[in-house]
C-alpha cells in the first residue's frame, strides 16, 4: 500500500512540472515504492508529449490523467484525490520545489496521531529567502487585527491553528477527513480556497493542524508583480465562502477595507523613508476603490 499520494494539477505547465518532479525524487526520504505520483492535466494544448516525458522521468507507475474539462484548480485536485490510493495526500503546485528531506516526518506524524488533519511546511522564495506566505489569518475577523497578527506571526514563525490557514501551494492532508468535508469547493475556479478548507475541516474534526518550519519548499513567486485582478478574485472568493457560512457581505468588505487601510498606512510611512514599493502602493489605492464600490452596493 502506498503511504502518500502526491497530486499535481497542470495546465500548460511544461516549464515547471519536470523540475517539480525532479525535486520530489531528490528529496524523497522514503522508498519510491511508497509514493503514488498523480498528475492531472486540465486540458493543456498538447498534454501527450508532457505525459511521455513524465513517464520517462518517473517511471511507468506514474498516474497520468487527462481531465475531461478544465474545471479549475480545485476540480482538478478532486479528480486526483478520488483516484488516489494512499491515506495521506500531498497537494503540490507545479511551481513548487522541495528543499529538505520531505516525507518521513509528516507521514510518521499522520501514522502516530489519528487526529492529525493537515501538515504544513515552511514556504521559501529562494533557498535563503523566506516567503511571507506559509500561513495566513482568516479573513473572518477584524481586518486591523488580522494584518498586525499576520505580520507578527510571520516574522516569528508562529502558527495558531484556530485562526490561521496553511498555504495551499504545498500541504499534506488526511484523505478520509478531506473527503468527509467535501474536498475542494468546485464552484471556485482558482485561488483563495485555503481558508474555506481550513474552516470546514476544523468545524468537523477540531484543531489537528500542524506547521513544521524545519521542512521547507520553494514556491516560485518571487518577482511577481502586484495584480489588482488577483486581489479582486480573492475578495470575490471570500465573499462567496463567507456567504455559505452566513457572514454578511458588509462584514467581509469591512474586513478587507481595514486590511487595505493598514497596508496603505504602512505604504505612506515607507514613502517618508524613501522605501515605498510604488507598484504595490498604486495597486492598494486602486483596490481600495474596488472595495468601497462593493460596499456601496452591499
Model-derived regions, located:
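Acidic donor-binding segment of Leloir-type glycosyltransferases
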Residues: 21-66
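Non-catalytic, C-terminal membrane-associated alpha-helical segments of glycosyltransferases
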Residues: 229-238, 242, 246-298
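Conserved donor NDP-sugar-binding/catalytic core segment of glycosyltransferases
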Residues: 101-134
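Glycine-rich, basic loop-to-helix element that forms the pyrophosphate-binding segment
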Residues: 66-84
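Short, flexible, basic/aromatic active-site loop/helix in glycosyltransferases
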Residues: 139-163
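A conserved hydrophobic helix/loop-capping motif in glycosyltransferases and polysaccharide synthases
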Residues: 4-16, 20, 27-28, 40
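A short, conserved alpha-helix in the catalytic core of glycosyltransferases
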Residues: 158, 164-183, 187-215
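Short aromatic/hydrophobic "clamp" motif used to bind/position activated sugar donors
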Residues: 89
Amino acid at each position: 500500500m502506498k503511504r502518500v499520494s502526491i497530486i499535481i494539477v497542470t495546465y500548460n505547465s511544461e516549464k515547471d512540472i519536470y523540475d517539480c518532479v525532479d525535486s520530489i525524487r531528490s528529496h524523497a526520504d522514503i522508498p519510491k515504492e511508497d509514493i503514488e505520483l498523480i498528475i492531472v492535466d486540465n486540458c493543456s494544448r498538447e498534454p501527450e508529449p508532457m505525459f511521455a516525458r513524465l513517464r520517462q522521468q518517473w517511471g511507468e507507475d506514474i498516474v497520468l490523467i487527462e481531465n475531461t474539462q478544465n474545471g479549475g484548480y480545485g476540480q482538478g485536485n478532486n479528480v486526483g484525490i478520488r483516484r488516489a490510493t494512499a491515506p495521506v495526500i500531498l497537494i503540490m503546485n507545479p511551481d513548487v520545489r522541495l528543499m529538505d528531506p520531505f516525507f518521513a516526518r509528516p507521514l510518521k506524524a499522520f501514522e502516530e496521531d489519528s487526529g492529525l488533519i493537515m501538515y504544513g511546511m515552511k514556504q521559501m522564495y529562494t533557498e535563503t529567502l523566506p516567503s511571507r506566505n506559509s500561513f495566513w489569518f482568516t479573513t473572518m475577523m477584524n481586518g486591523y487585527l488580522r494584518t498586525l497578527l499576520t505580520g507578527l506571526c510571520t516574522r516569528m514563525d508562529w502558527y495558531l491553528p484556530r485562526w490561521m490557514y496553511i498555504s495551499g501551494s504545498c500541504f499534506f492532508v488526511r484523505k478520509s477527513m478531506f473527503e468527509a468535508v467535501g474536498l475542494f469547493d468546485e464552484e471556485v475556479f482558482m485561488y483563495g480556497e485555503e481558508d474555506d478548507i481550513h474552516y470546514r475541516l476544523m468545524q468537523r474534526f477540531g484543531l489537528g493542524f500542524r506547521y513544521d518550519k524545519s521542512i521547507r519548499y520553494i514556491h516560485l513567486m518571487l518577482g511577481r508583480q502586484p495584480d489588482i485582478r488577483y486581489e479582486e478574485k480573492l475578495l470575490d472568493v471570500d465573499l462567496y465562502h463567507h456567504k455559505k457560512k452566513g457572514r454578511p457581505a458588509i462584514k467581509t468588505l469591512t474586513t478587507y477595507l481595514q486590511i487595505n487601510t493598514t497596508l496603505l498606512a504602512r505604504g505612506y510611512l515607507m514613502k517618508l523613508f524613501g522605501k515605498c514599493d510604488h507598484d504595490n502602493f498604486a495597486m492598494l489605492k486602486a483596490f481600495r476603490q474596488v472595495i468601497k464600490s462593493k460596499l456601496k452596493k452591499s
